[in-house]
A protein has these predicted regions:
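Conserved catalytic submotifs in the C-terminal HATPase_c
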Residues: 112-117, 134, 139-149
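Short alpha-helical Gxxx[C/S/T] motif in the catalytic ATP-binding
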Residues: 230, 234
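Primarily the dimerization/phosphotransfer
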Residues: 31-65, 70
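Short alpha-helical segment of the dimerization/phosphotransfer core of two-component systems
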Residues: 86-91
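Conserved glycine-rich
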Residues: 242-243
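Short conserved segment of the HATPase_c
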Residues: 201-215
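Conserved micro-motifs of the catalytic ATP-binding
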Residues: 106-111, 150-153
Length: 266
């Protein structure tokens, strides 16, 4: 019996250590679960809040049209159908953004990297926004240190991040202004800067521009309602590539967003 007690005494510290380790792991998992629940609750709240109005608009105007279709003029019908279309477009865009946000925050989120010409990728993103820039008479200036800058990236994800930043630059820019896009290669990084002459961001709002669901201005310079997830998604994508994104701004003067990507593979 004495021998058994000695053996028991020997294993007690090991057992205590295992229990403590298990407790810490359980606490960590509990914190992760609580964070996930909080995030999901926030998403659900935003879904309800942001979709309630446009869905209500679609229902109301559809009901009006169905009840009085015979009395509708072509002009009135066209106006009401446009309102329905705008509400549906916003709803679909919002759901798409929520889907992207959920994807980049998933534990299974991964990149499909390939060796690409980054200069060409940035140029293709700029081309996609030329029509929008033209509609607001905004000039797009490009300054690339080289036409051939090769990086190992996920093409679709980086395109998404760049598109978000450039879209915001155009959205918050006034008409007859300029947006500058520069790409500069250094020894270990590639720096992309997108600078606009728009409405700018206040010192109070600037530290929170990458926060989830944070909207600096409810309406942009072109009166488009914002969701507040685009830059948060872009930040996740850039950081997944081991990069950094930052913002500087002067209210009523404009903003400058800088994306730094490593030359090394991710």
């Amino acid at each position: 019996m004495v021998k058994k007690e000695k053996n028991s005494d020997k294993y007690i510290p090991e057992l205590e250590e295992k229990i403590i380790d298990l407790s810490l792991k359980l606490k960590s998992k509990s914190n992760e679960l609580n964070a996930a629940i909080e995030t999901n609750s926030k998403i659900l709240g935003k879904l309800t809040h942001n979709l309630k109005n446009p869905v209500g608009v679609i229902f109301s105007f559809s009901e009006m049209i169905l009840e009085d279709l015979e009395d509708y003029s072509a002009e009135k019908l066209g106006k009401h159908m446009q309102i329905i279309k705008n509400s549906a477009t916003f709803s679909l865009a919002f759901l798409d953004t929520i889907s992207k946000y959920t994807r980049v925050n998933s534990p299974n989120y991964s990149l499909k990297t390939e060796r690409i010409n980054y200069s060409e990728l940035v140029n293709s993103v700029i081309i996609d926004f030329k029509v929008k820039a033209f509609e607001k008479n905004i000039g797009l200036e490009m300054n690339f240190s080289s036409k051939e800058i090769f990086l190992t990236l996920d093409r679709d994800e980086i395109t998404q991040a760049l598109s978000t930043v450039l879209n915001n630059a155009l959205r918050y820019s006034n008409e007859n202004s300029t947006v500058n896009i520069s790409v500069e290669e250094t020894k270990n990084t590639v720096e992309t800067a997108i600078t606009d002459q728009g409405i700018g961001i206040s010192d109070a709002d600037l530290p929170r521009v990458f926060d989830e669901f944070y909207v600096v201005n409810t309406y942009s310079a072109d009166k488009q309602k914002c969701i507040g997830l685009g830059l948060a998604i872009a930040k996740k994508i850039i950081e997944k590539h081991k990069g950094k994104i930052s913002a500087n701004s002067i209210l009523e003067k404009g903003s400058r967003f800088k994306i730094i990507l490593p030359v090394i593979s991710v």
